[in-house]
Amino acid sequence: GCKARGDTCQKDCDCCGCFYKCHCPLDWFGGKWHPLGCSCVYGDKYICEKKKKECPNV
């Protein structure tokens, strides 16, 4: 299943829905190391287009 808003995630595709993205407050190294962790947050119409291309479950 997918992760709801506020849940810990590793990538955008982990998050439920087209408009939710995986946000990392301190994403220093391009997504490889997350000192504070990442969580699903509400994005925008652009994340929806990106997820439609990249995620099999959208």
UniProtKB/Swiss-Prot annotation:
Q: Where in the cell is it found?
A: Secreted
Q: Which GO terms describe its molecular function?
A: toxin activity
Q: What GO CC annotations are associated with the protein?
A: extracellular region
* Top-level taxon in the UniProt lineage: Eukaryota
Here the disulfide bonds are 2-16, 9-22, 13-48, 15-40, 18-55, 24-38
Location (main, coarse): secreted
**Tissue expression as described in the entry:** Expressed by the venom gland.
Q: Which UniProt keywords apply?
A: Disulfide bond, Knottin, Neurotoxin, Secreted, Toxin
State the domain notes: The presence of a 'disulfide through disulfide knot' structurally defines this protein as a knottin.
Sum up the protein's function in the record's words. Answer: Probable neurotoxin.
What family does this chain come from, according to its entry?
A: Belongs to the neurotoxin 09 (Tx3-6) family.
- What is the protein name given in its UniProt record? U7-ctenitoxin-Pr1a
Q: Could you tell me which species this protein originates from?
A: Phoneutria reidyi
